[in-house]
A protein has these predicted regions:
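Catalytic cores of soluble, metal-dependent hydrolases
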Residues: 1-58, 65-69, 75-79, 151-277
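Active-site histidine-anchored catalytic micro-motif
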Residues: 55-126, 135, 228
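Short, structured patches in soluble enzyme cores that scaffold and shape functional sites
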Residues: 88-91, 115, 140-143, 161-163, ...
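Internal, well-ordered alpha-helical segments in soluble enzyme and binding-protein domains
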Residues: 91, 107-110, 132, 148, ...
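Active-site environment of divalent metal-dependent phosphoester hydrolases
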Residues: 96, 144-146, 241-243
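Short capping/connector residues at structural and topological boundaries
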Residues: 100, 116-119, 132, 202, ...
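Active-site-proximal loop/helix segment associated with metal-binding centers of metalloenzymes
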Residues: 125-126, 142-160
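Aromatic-lined glycan-binding groove of carbohydrate-active enzymes
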Residues: 133-135, 142-148, 184-188
């Protein structure tokens, strides 16, 4: 699909695992902490390397992969002297720390880790550069734990839950955020979780939450991102093919990516957006 849109595409293959070191935390609910810590390090290095002269698209996996992608991209942004912004499209903010997560599922911590929240030192890889929480926009939230709500407010993350989208519409909320990115000449990473979408159109995810983005809302987000010319990297995460219905969730994720990368019904004036992916 991307090739048909005129983009040069190279499959970089799977990230290679690195040795796992023993890590023990007082929160005994944490699942696979040593393994995810090791994968975070490996993915971070891969993201840093892949973002040198191209727009990387990272395929998960659950959302824990974004602890690695975002931290690696933040390091790249710091090396180029530009700020990294993150658009987090998700039913959940994934803003737990290792201490606050009751489930122990580490796909609930990546945004807290990548933004430099406390409690990860000694357990996750050190952060060469953290994302400024005020440059993070979460959109589509509809399942937020009390500890996450407090942390989001204290950190200053931009939060647009589904009520805000219902009240104001998704376009003006996204337009305001993109204006901030543009004003600071920032790099923009988009992290798209399948559960951002309503489960009626995207059932292939293990963490479905009713009331998500509609088909047209999701495509509008991608079309606006494409028009902006600001996106520098992309996560596609949480797709579970075993839960899909004749591949319709996978097809939708491909179509959304195509909208982000320039597929449109009619031509519109946009900023130049071309290169290798």
């Amino acid at each position: 699909v991307l090739s048909s849109l005129g983009h040069a595409v190279e499959d970089m293959g799977a990230v290679q695992a690195i040795p796992v070191r023993r890590v023990v935390h007082r929160n005994l609910a944490l699942k696979a902490l040593p393994e995810i810590s090791a994968w975070t390090s490996a993915i971070s290095e891969a993201a840093y390397a892949a973002s040198e002269d191209a727009m990387p698209i990272f395929l998960g996996g659950d959302h824990s992969v974004s602890a690695g992608t975002v931290s690696g991209l933040a390091r790249r942004a710091a090396a180029t002297g530009r700020p990294l912004f993150v658009l987090w499209l998700d039913a959940h903010p994934d803003f737990h720390t290792l201490d606050t997560t009751a489930s122990g599922n580490l796909h609930g911590v990546p945004l807290a880790y990548a933004s430099g929240q406390q409690g990860f030192a000694g357990y996750f890889p050190d952060l060469p550069a953290a994302v400024d929480p005020s440059r993070i926009c979460t959109m589509g939230l509809r399942s937020v734990d009390p500890a996450e709500r407090r942390a989001l407010n204290e950190a200053g993350v931009i939060v647009h839950d589904m009520r805000a989208i219902d009240e104001h519409g998704i376009a003006p909320l996204l337009r305001d955020f993109l204006a901030h990115v543009s004003a600071e000449a920032g790099l923009l990473h988009v992290s798209l979780d399948v559960d951002f979408l309503d489960p009626s159109i995207a059932p292939a995810v293990g963490t479905t939450v009713p009331g998500g983005a509609t088909f047209r809302e999701a495509h509008l987000v991608m079309e606006m991102l494409s028009d902006s010319g600001l996106v520098s990297s992309l996560d596609l995460v949480e797709l579970n093919p075993f839960l899909d219905e004749r591949g319709r969730t996978a097809t939708l994720m491909v179509d959304l990516t195509a909208s982000l990368m320039g597929r449109r019904i009619m031509d519109r004036p946009t900023r130049s957006h071309s290169g290798s992916f």
